[in-house]
Amino acid sequence: WTSDGSAEDSGKEKKRAGCLLYNGKYVYFDKNGYALESYEKKYDDVPLVTGLKYDELVMQEKIPVKKEKVFSYLLELTTAIDKYNLSIDQIYIKEDGNALLISDKITVDLYNKKDIDIKISELAGMLKKVKGKSGTIDMKYFSEDHKIAVFQPKKSWKNLVKKVSLS
């Protein structure tokens, strides 16, 4: 038993928090940032992380990221995604270190690293509302006090282009 009263099973498989594409294979990592295993198969329930800068990966070792702050933010994100059972296909780390989440045809711009737990918990309901649509959920104005997110549907070209008769 551990100090928090939960049973610890040393034989238990570690949970995959996310994966990176490395040398043509998917390398899965846990919530502590350790590379667990690599497979050619991508598991649907594990978000693919793109845009992260890191050095060579070694199994069972911590992923050697260029910016530790960005990585701890990523791990905070994957933990919240798992906690609220969100279906996220991809987490894209932008140049500024902030993240875009991609779920089916919806892109979520988290905008900054604030209020992650609240943003992700609210996102579960938002994603249900826009299921089947394509577009962007912008969380630029979202905070604990002002739960505001803007959904911008993706414009389809066929609606914009008027039919021209060639007769």
Model-inferred region functions:
Residues 1-167:
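Charged, solvent-exposed interaction patches on well-folded alpha/beta domains
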